[in-house]
Amino acid sequence: MLHPKFVITRAGYLRIGTVHMHRDLLQPGDRCLGGGYWEIDYVDNCLELSGLSYDYGEPRWCEITTLLVPQSYRGMGIRYEGKELATVRVRYY
C-alpha cells in the first residue's frame, strides 16, 4: 500500500512522495538522515511532517543547516510534529 512519506538527505534535500518504502524516495548516492510521514494542512497552508521511518529513524534536523524543499511547496509553512523548523533555513529548488 502507498503512503505519503518523506526523507531528508545528508545534502539537505527533502524528498517527498507517496511510496511503499522510505527508501523509494532516495536517489543513487543519497545518505538518509531519517524520515516520516507528511500531509498538507490546507487551512493553515502548511506542510505537516511527522513520525519516523522504521528503516532510517526520526529525522535528524540538527545535522543540516539548510533544508532544500521542492519548488512546488513555496509559500507554505513547514512544521514537524506541530513545531516550526526554526533552526533550519529553508531554500527551494
Please give the residue ranges for each predicted region.
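Eukaryotic phosphoinositide-binding membrane-targeting regions
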Residues: 1-93
